[in-house]
């Protein structure tokens, strides 16, 4: 009976030492490993010889079904039969694949499984020629790309599908009824009234009326007063009572204190009237003293009363208070005949005008400042 070598490989042989728990090399040179098959006994055996010496056996291992073969790495394999552990460090991956694949097939045949040929040539090196074959594959790719272009016209038919969606806009008309919302904002202008008081507004109104209308009327009274001082005592009495009678032409300053909402306007007018009365009283005393030694010129202006009476006849309201006050003002009548009192009265009236104007301007400026401060405070 003869044995035949099935496959062989080259590698360094190791044995496992349980004492040191390490792999111990059996030789320092690679060994030749061969698997033998005995066709008569149907047995397998692994033989490993060190170097070129055919009698230096490193492995003489009978392969049975109990043997376990494992691959620790690509080039280091090991097998054991519960007594000895062998490790083979192959010189190349190809030798490792050849020996490992053949050994596994032997174990499979011993266990009753179908034999498989050892993968001795699974990785042939002629793989380099297929690389130049890749360039010829590019032309078909370009040819395939050309038919893809005609697929673009398929998209246009989808556009008409969107067209039927156009009828949706008619639903928009019901929106117009919303605009009537804006009217509520107008009630906002109320806050400015809270800035200043009603008394201040009334005071400003009275001061403005006094400065515009009252002063103009007093000027007319002053002009007319010059004539009666020379002619009749009735005109002088009417001018002296201008602050008390509301119906007279020169009595416009008197209503100002009554119509003013606050106390500032009334106090101002009261002070002005008091100053005016004092000035008139002071002016009347020297006139009486100066007119006392010259009573003779009194009969000269007797014909003058006729035009004055005719000029003052239309306003009946003015003639009535003159009759009432004539009795009270009879004593100073001699002073009216003198020409000097008219000039003195005009100067006093002019100074009084200036004082009234200055006082009114001051009060108006104060009122303006107060109104501005109130408006600024209300805004903050």
From Swiss-Prot:
Region of interest (EVH2 block B), ranges: 263-280
A GO BP entry is: actin filament polymerization
Region of interest called Disordered, as start-end residue ranges on this chain:
94-346
Q: Quaternary structure? A: May self-associate. Binds F-actin and G-actin. Binds to the FH2 domain of forH.
* Residue span of region EVH2: 229-380
Broad class of the protein's primary localization: cytoplasm
**Family annotation (PANTHER family):** PROTEIN ENABLED, SPROUTY-RELATED, EVH1 DOMAIN-CONTAINING PROTEIN FAMILY MEMBER
- What GO annotations for molecular function exist for this entry? actin binding; SH3 domain binding
Q: InterPro entries from the xrefs? A: PH-like_dom_sf, VASP/EVL, VASP_sf, VASP_tetra, WH1/EVH1_dom, WH2_dom
Q: Where is this region: 2 X 15 AA tandem repeats of [LI]-Q-[SK]-[AL]-K-[DE]-E-I-L-[ET]-[AE]-[IV]-[KR]-[ES]?
A: 349-378
Domain WH1 as annotated: residue spans: 1-110
Taxonomy, superkingdom: Eukaryota
Q: Please give the GO cellular component terms listed in this UniProt entry.
A: cell cortex; cell leading edge; cytoskeleton; cytosol; filopodium; filopodium tip; macropinosome; phagocytic cup lip
Instruction: Write out the ranges of the repeats annotated as sequence.
Output: 349-363, 364-378
Biological classification of the source: Eukaryota, Amoebozoa, Evosea, Eumycetozoa, Dictyostelia
Gene name for this UniProt entry: vasp
SMART domains, per the entry = WH1 (SM00461)
Segments of skewed composition (Low complexity): 233-259, 307-342
Residue spans making up a coiled coil are 350-380
Q: What is known of its domains?
A: The EVH2 domain is comprised of 3 regions. Block A is a thymosin-like domain required for G-actin binding and actin polymerization. Block B is required for F-actin binding and subcellular location, and Block C for self-association.
Report the residue ranges that make up the WH2 domain in this protein.
199-218
Q: What protein name does the entry list? A: Protein VASP homolog
Disulfide bridge partners, by residue number = none
Could you tell me the keywords of this UniProt record?
Actin-binding, Cell adhesion, Cell projection, Chemotaxis, Coiled coil, Cytoplasm, Cytoskeleton, Repeat
Q: Which PROSITE patterns match?
A: WH1, WH2
């Amino acid at each position: 009976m003869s044995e035949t070598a099935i496959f062989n490989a080259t590698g360094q042989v190791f044995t496992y030492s349980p004492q040191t728990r390490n792999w111990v090399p059996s030789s320092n040179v690679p060994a030749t490993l061969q698997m033998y098959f005995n066709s008569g006994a149907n047995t397998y055996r692994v033989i490993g010889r060190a170097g070129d010496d055919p009698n230096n056996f490193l492995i003489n291992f009978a392969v049975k079904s109990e043997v376990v073969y494992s691959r620790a790495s690509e080039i280091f394999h090991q097998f054991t039969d519960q007594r000895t552990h062998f490790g083979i460090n192959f010189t190349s991956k190809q030798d490792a694949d050849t020996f490992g694949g053949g050994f596994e097939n032997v174990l499979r045949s011993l266990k009753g499984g179908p034999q498989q040929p050892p993968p001795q040539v699974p990785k042939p090196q002629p793989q380099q020629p297929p690389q130049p074959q890749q360039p010829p594959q590019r032309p078909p790719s370009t040819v395939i790309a050309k038919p893809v272009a005609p697929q673009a016209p398929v998209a246009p038919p989808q556009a008409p599908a969107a067209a039927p969606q156009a009828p949706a806009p008619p639903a928009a008309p019901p929106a117009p009824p919303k605009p009537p919302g804006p009217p509520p904002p107008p009630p906002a202008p109320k806050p400015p009234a809270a800035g200043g008081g009603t008394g201040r507004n009334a005071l400003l109104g009275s001061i403005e009326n006094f400065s515009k209308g009252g002063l103009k009327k007093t000027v007319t009274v002053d002009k007319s007063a010059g004539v009666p001082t020379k002619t009749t005592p009735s005109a002088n009495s009417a001018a002296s009572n201008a602050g008390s009678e509301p119906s007279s032409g020169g009595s416009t300053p008197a209503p100002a204190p009554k119509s003013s909402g606050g106390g500032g306007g009334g106090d101002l007018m009261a002070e002005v009237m008091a100053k005016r009365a004092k000035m008139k009283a002071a002016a009347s005393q020297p006139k009486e003293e100066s007119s006392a030694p010259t009573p003779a010129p009194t009969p000269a202006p007797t014909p003058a009363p006729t035009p004055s009476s005719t000029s003052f006849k239309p306003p009946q309201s003015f003639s009535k208070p003159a009759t009432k006050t004539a009795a009270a003002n009879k004593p100073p009548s001699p002073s009216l005949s003198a020409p000097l009192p008219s000039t003195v009265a005009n100067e006093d009236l002019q100074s009084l005008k200036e004082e009234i104007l200055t006082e009114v301007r001051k009060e108006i400026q104060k009122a303006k400042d107060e109104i501005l401060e109130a408006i600024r405070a209300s805004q903050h």
